Design a protein with these regions (language model features):
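Short Cys/His-rich Zn2+-coordinating modules
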Residues: 6-15, 82-84
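Short cysteine-rich clusters marking metal-coordination/redox-active sites
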Residues: 7-11, 26-32
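Secreted/processed peptides and extracellular or luminal domains of membrane proteins
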Residues: 13-16, 35-38, 147
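Short linker/helix segments within small regulatory modules
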Residues: 17-26
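Short metal-binding segments enriched for Cys and/or His
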Residues: 33-51, 56
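Accessory beta->alpha helical hairpin/"wing" motif in late/C-terminal subdomains of nucleic-acid enzymes
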Residues: 38, 148-170
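Short amphipathic alpha-helical interface segments
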Residues: 53-128
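Short amphipathic alpha-helical interaction segments
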Residues: 126-143
Length: 171
């Protein structure tokens, strides 16, 4: 049975489902993707007590797993994720742009395909703490002529589409 809850990472609405024979629950969030919180009575406060910037990096990690079709990560004590937090905090601006291009390319079956990007929802894709960071990465991709703004969204340029295809092949 699913119920509406607040995501412990981004503090937005999410769906919570209990899984039989497992201690914990599964979360599906539009921003963070999907994850399993093990032993919530023990570990939930270790996440909610983290600074928002640290939770945003865990959100980027869970969204990354979701976007790359990996199994939803199991979150336990937030301390065990300290290496992941550091890894995501240290992503270069180039890494952020490449992940945005890959994200758009996966949604583009062909060159010139219109993709709706929502900074409020998609900011973890650029390893950003908030929608402002997403907009900065997107604007830079536009300046580099990898992405172009069109009337109802964004599309990859030929150069962006080629880069996105190359990144998809490396996955």
């Amino acid at each position: 049975m699913k119920e509406e809850v607040i995501c412990i990472l981004c503090e937005r609405n999410a769906e919570k489902a209990h899984i039989p024979d497992k201690v914990g629950y599964f979360i599906k969030c539009d921003i963070c993707g999907e994850y399993f919180l093990a032993s919530p009575e023990i570990f939930e406060s270790s996440y909610t007590d983290l600074p928002r910037e640290k939770r945003a990096m865990i959100s980027s990690y869970t969204r990354d797993c979701f976007e790359h079709s990996k199994e939803p990560p199991q979150l336990e004590d937030a301390g065990y994720l300290s290496g992941i937090i550091t890894e995501y905090e240290n992503k270069s601006f180039d890494d952020k742009i490449k992940n945005l291009i890959l994200f758009i390319r996966k949604k583009s079956p062909e060159l010139g395909y219109n993709v709706l990007l929502e900074a409020q929802k998609d900011y973890p894709v650029t390893y950003s703490v908030d929608p402002g960071g997403f907009k900065e990465v997107l604007n830079n991709a536009v300046e580099q002529r990898l992405v172009r703004s069109i009337e109802s969204g964004f599309e990859l340029t030929e150069q962006g589409y080629a880069l996105g295809t190359e990144l998809m092949e490396k996955e």
